[in-house]
Amino acid sequence: SGCAVNVGRGGYQAAYSVEEQIFETREQLRRLFHFTSGRGKNVIFTQNITMSLNILLKGILKPGDHVLVTSMEHNAVMRPLVQLQRQGVTFDRIPCDHEGNLILSEADALVKPNTRLLVCLHASNVCGTRMPLDALGEICQRHQLYFVVDSAQTAGIVPINMDKMHIDALAFT
C-alpha cells in the first residue's frame, strides 16, 4: 500500500504482520546456520557486515582485553581493532603461510590470560582460502573465548554449523 510500518512500535495489523515476517526470517536464519542454542531474538539485523563487526567488537571489548585475529583479516575487523588499540585493547595475528592457509599450530601459544575473543573471516576475499572453523572453535572452547566469524564470502554457500563450530557470533549479508 506504500505506507511505512513501524515494527515493534505500531499497534496496527500491518505492523504485526511485518513483525511476524521478521521473526520468521530470524528463525529461518537460525536454522540455516544451526544456531539451536538461541532463538530468533538472538538474530539481529544491521546495515552490513562492517557495522555488525563494529558493534560486536566495540560492545564486547574493554581496555586491557586481548584479541586473536588471522593475518588475513579484512579491514572491517582491523580498523575497529586499531581504533580500540588506542583504548588499551591489544591483538595478535595468527599467521598464515604463503598460500593463505592458517598456521593453526601457532594459535594456542598466542592465547594470553586476558584474551577475550578470536575473530576471523571464514574465507579470504583475496585468495579464497578458508579458515578451519572447526579447529578454531575448539581452541575458543578450550580457552573460553568468544568466537566471532565474518562469513561475507561463504554464508549461504558453504555450510556453517554455529553449534558444532562453537561460533558465538556470525556476521553475514
Located regions from the model:
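Pyridoxal 5′-phosphate
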Residues: S1-T173
